[in-house]
């Protein structure tokens, strides 16, 4: 008996162009025979469902009650046993690498000489359609005994071999379609992402939030401190900006009477790229009338915990080999409290001395803006000394007014706002606050932002006169929060790079 293993052969250093040329020749032959890419095959079963339902059946049970199946999938393995029989493995979209695959068995007696000869010429990566009955092999593997075999789609490019896969990380990002075919972990990551976003939507709807869509093109970039992408609207002959945040439009809806709204969509910020930053990213922002930042913290915690459970199966995660428990109540610290905890060398007097903090920041290579007050300086020192150490979920609260132009000021402590940011594994995940609904105060803060921009702060906000007009009609007391979906998904899926949770991350152009 002779065997031929295409999977092993694929690992040989064969010239890829030669393989492609051979496959194109096969496709040309198919065209001459008739329809090369048929669209009349309708699969009725999925590999994962068959494995779940019949995987525990014995050989005798399957023989006593034959199960007929019709299935399509990509051929990932092929093993020929002489000229009269062959095994192959098909992979479909029904599960991960294990339960999304099923073995097929093709014999000369059952499928005929033509089908047997055709299978010999089929290549790994081809999409096949099969019909037949289930049985168990001697090694107890659930297998389809094929009675009909069809080529649905001819693959022209060879798949990477199973032992090395896509070795280059950039190629994985650039050719995500190949990565998804070959990599079980990649498929699992993006299924978890979908499950988490679906969980968030269900959670919001259960709590009477209405999902809305607000503009992607803005006439004034607003809602966050960030540098926008600019574009030009030809018909209106005006400069426009890809949105950096939907916040001001969502709060206009609260003014209009929609007390609970949320949006899951893309934001764009023309800033740096890193393992935690992508210029195009997904946010979930929500606003609830008659709530405050304390209510928001409890609610945000519940949203994230449920998303982790629905996507991962448990609220106890592992990130980078270290446990992260989202089931426990999240911690809460002030900015100064966090510095005291993680950098206890600083005294109370030093943390309230603006000139001392400026000198310390200089040691970290940070040059604050000339107009920065004590609160902004404390925040900058927190970012250098404490932020990276916030492993467990922690709300940092009571941000200074000067860095929170849209947040409501505290009624009890001068100079701070009812604002929080949520951190875990050393990175920001969410930002929320009791919204500023005093139109005159908001106008004054916008003016301060304009002054900061004139002084050289590129991330300072613009003055939005229409938003002020909306507030002048009256916005009820409101709490609002934004959750970074991509960063949250990095944590839920234990992914070290934000590109790992983006199907098609931004990359430089190919040469």
From Swiss-Prot:
Species: Herminiimonas arsenicoxydans
Coiled coil (residue ranges): none
Keyword Disulfide bond found: no
Cofactor(s) listed in the protein's UniProt record: Mg(2+)
Annotated residues for binding of Mg(2+) 2: 428
GO annotations of cellular component type: cytosol
Protein name as it appears in the record: Lysine--tRNA ligase
Listed EC numbers: 6.1.1.6
Protein's UniProt keywords contain Aminoacyl-tRNA synthetase: yes
Keywords: Aminoacyl-tRNA synthetase, ATP-binding, Cytoplasm, Ligase, Magnesium, Metal-binding, Nucleotide-binding, Protein biosynthesis
Record-listed Mg(2+) 1 binding positions: 421, 428
Database matches in NCBIfam families: lysS_bact, PRK00484.1
GO biological process, one term: lysyl-tRNA aminoacylation
Protein's cellular compartments: Cytoplasm
Leader peptide range in chain numbering: none
Subunit structure, as described in the record: Homodimer.
Family classification: Belongs to the class-II aminoacyl-tRNA synthetase family.
